[in-house]
Structure formats: C-alpha cells, structure tokens
From Swiss-Prot:
Similarity comment: Belongs to the metallo-dependent hydrolases superfamily. HutI family.
Gene Ontology annotations of biological process type: L-histidine catabolic process to glutamate and formamide; L-histidine catabolic process to glutamate and formate
Name of the protein in its database record: Imidazolonepropionase
Residues at which N-formimidoyl-L-glutamate binds: Y140, N303, G305
Residues given in the record as Fe(3+) binding sites: H73, H75, H227, D301
Cofactor: Zn(2+); Fe(3+)
Organism of this sequence: Nocardioides sp. (strain ATCC BAA-499 / JS614)
Lineage of origin: Bacteria, Bacillati, Actinomycetota, Actinomycetes, Propionibacteriales
Pfam families named in the record: Amidohydro_1 (PF01979)
Main location: cytoplasm
Pathway: Amino-acid degradation; L-histidine degradation into L-glutamate; N-formimidoyl-L-glutamate from L-histidine: step 3/3
Length: 391
C-alpha cells in the first residue's frame, strides 16, 4: 500500500499523550513538521527536515494540521425541521406546535431512503468542517420498529451508534414505557448499537428510571451514556459518575458535589455549547470543571430542535469565547477528549496524530489552531482526511 508524506506543515497538532512530559504542552505541537501515512494509519511524525521518504508527497503550504474532530454527541436521524420553533424562540413569542414530537412524527413518516439521504447530507457537511468521527443517536422513533430502523440507518455512517429510546416520555404510563425500552425496544436495537443513552432530566426520566435502562443496556452488551443536568440541577451527573460511565453530556447546572464526582470518577463532561447558543440559555462553566481536574470534551449535539449546527469549529469558538477555555483546551476537547468520550483513544484509535493511530486529520487554511477561535464563522478547514485518504 502506498505511503504518503505530508510536509511543509506550519503547525502540527499531535495530541501526543506524552507531550506534557517533554515540554510540548497539551496539544503536542510540532512546528515546521511533517507526517507519514501508511495505508490508513500514521507511521511517522516529526520535523520536516527529518522526514523519511514516501511514495507520494503532499505539500501543506505552511498550514496547520490537526487531528480530525471527534463529534461524540449528535442526533442526525430525523426528518423535517423546526425552523418555525426556532424563529419563535428567538422572537420571545409562544410556540404551540409539538416540539420534539413534531420531529418524531416526521421521522416515523419518512422512508428509510429519505432518512439515509438526510443523514448522508449532514455527515458530508460535518466532513467539510473537519469532523472525521461522529456518534449518532436514535431517539426520534420511540417505537420498537422506528428505533431499530433509525439505528440501522445510522450504522451505515458510523460504528458509534447510540440507542436513545429513552429520549422523551410519551403520553401514557412512564413505567410501561421504561418496560418497553428495556424489553422489546432494546432487543430490536441492540444489534445496531454500541451505546445506550438516557435523557435524565426533570420532566423526562428520573435517576431510578435511568439506572434501570442503563443496567438493562449493560446486560445486553451496550455501553452507557447519559444526558444530564442540562435544564436544572439533578441527580444525573452523580449517577453517571457512580456507574462509571465514560461520559455524561450537557453538564450545565452542576453543584460542587457533581464536579467532585466527575473528578473522582474520571467520567468525561461533554459540553455542547451550540445548544446554549441556539437557545439563549446559560453556558456550562468549562473553566470551573477544568480547574477542578475534570476531563472535558466538546461536541455539537446536532439536532433539529435545540441545536441545528454540525460545526465543531463553531463549538470551539463558543467554548473559548463563552466558557472560559483556551484555544488549546478547546481543540483538545474536540479531538482527543472526544475520542476518549467514545473510548476510542487506544493505541490504534483516533483523536491523535501519533504512530499507530488512524490517519484522520484536518488541514486548516490558517497557520495555527488558534484561528479556529480567533476567526469564528470562517470556513477554515481546507481539507479533511479520513483513514489516510483525502476527501
């Protein structure tokens, strides 16, 4: 298989886990750099002057190169949109339509082909903005058949599929619905999913219901995730820490004991600033979490209701401007920490440009990663590579 040398890289963000020990800082930056790709993996990284020969040569033109973004939280399998709801929210006027239930109805009415085409467009949109790995949830079907087919659609685009039958409590008996989620729905979904998720929030699923659903998922071989503490203080974050979940998402309203639980458990707090941007709600306090020693990831939460953006560069800019993160912390959170939030940061994983990792990368039309926050709204991703191939 042909090897490729990408040289004349002005700034190479490696996310080398050993970088902090040798003085290269959080991002493991190498200046005037090069990297060699062999097949789908990174084979060599270092100074351009020391680069070995390869079969093909690519000149980066002094641009910055960084690991592809890892979007560990999205809801891409849906039909229709809720633009009227967004416009009403921005105008501060009441909106009487059905919210998430509008999306559920449209998704159930769509064909598999329509859903697949829609997800393909969104994934391509993400790729153009540097995202190389995306997690995709179900959650707009809420029947045995529609949850299973939503996951089957998602599986065409990613291995990181998440069963979110516990997205909203339908009309009727909540206990009966939990039984449905943990029984027939889980049985139908498990073959298409790697993860199971619950929206643990006041007005949705409480901590006891979330625990029951996550326990059932674990018994079926699915790893647990959790939406928690988005709308108010609650038990969800502490439940995630108690269960040792790899990540818990939103984390907007946190008591001191929530922060301590995240720190002590090692559970990653995945922050979703696009939601707060799109809903005019308070942003999570990333600075507080980082200073407490909590691991923080960033993701898009791309969905038709609370956050219809697929742009990780926008999320990075918001995290820096509104949540107290440095540009380096935000880039690290959207790459390496995102990989950790999907438990994909191992020797042959993603989220870093070091030998043995998958060659997923973004080439910026800028000399430094700082420009992602410095120039918000500018399409800075010049080219995206996935598994060693340029798109």
């Amino acid at each position: 298989m042909a090897s490729t040398l990408i040289t004349n890289i002005g700034e190479l963000v490696t996310n080398d886990p050993e970088a902090a020990d040798d003085g290269r800082g959080l991002l493991g930056i190498v200046e005037q750099a090069a990297l060699v790709i062999d097949g789908s993996t990174v084979a060599w990284v270092g100074r351009a002057a020391d680069a070995p020969d390869a079969d093909q040569l690519v000149d980066a033109g002094g641009r910055a190169v960084l690991p592809g973004f890892v979007d560990s939280h999205s809801h891409l399998v849906f039909a229709g949109d809720r633009a009227a709801e967004f416009a009403a929210r921005m105008a501060g006027t009441p909106y009487a339509a059905g919210g998430i239930r509008t999306t559920v109805a449209a998704t159930r009415a769509a064909t598999d082909e329509q859903l697949t085409s829609h997800v393909a467009r969104l994934v391509e949109e993400m790729r153009r903005q540097g995202t190389t790995t995306v997690e995709i949830k179900s959650g707009y079907g809420l029947t045995v058949h529609d949850e299973a087919r939503s996951l089957a659609v998602a599986r065409q685009f990613t291995e990181e599929t998440t069963f979110l039958g516990a997205h909203v409590v339908p009309d009727g008996d909540p206990g009966e619905y939990v039984d449905l989620v943990t029984g027939p729905m889980l049985d139908a979904a498990r073959e298409h999913a790697r993860w199971i998720d619950v929206f643990c929030e006041r007005g949705a699923f409480d901590a006891d219901q979330a625990r029951a659903i996550l326990d059932a998922g674990a018994a079926a071989g699915l790893r647990g995730r959790l939406h928690a503490n988005q709308l108010t203080y609650g038990e969800g974050v502490r439940l995630a820490a108690e269960l040792g979940l790899v990540a818990v998402d939103h984390c907007t309203y946190l008591a001191d004991e929530d922060v301590a639980a995240l720190r002590d458990s090692g559970t990653i707090a995945t922050l979703l600033p696009g939601v707060e941007f799109s809903t005019r709600q308070p942003y999570p306090d990333a600075r507080r979490l980082l200073d407490a020693g909590v691991r923080v990831a960033l993701a898009s939460d791309c969905n038709p209701g609370s956050c219809f953006t697929s742009s990780i560069p926008l999320c990075i800019a918001l995290a820096v401007r509104e949540m107290g993160m440095t540009p380096a912390e935000a880039v690290h959170a959207a790459t390496y920490r995102g990989a950790q939030a999907l438990d994909r940061d191992g020797q042959h994983g993603i989220g870093a440009l070091v030998p043995g990792r998958r060659a997923d990368l973004a080439v910026l039309d800028a000399p430094s990663h700082v420009h992602l926050a410095y120039r918000p709204g500018v399409p800075l991703v010049r080219q995206t590579w996935v598994a060693g191939r340029p798109l």
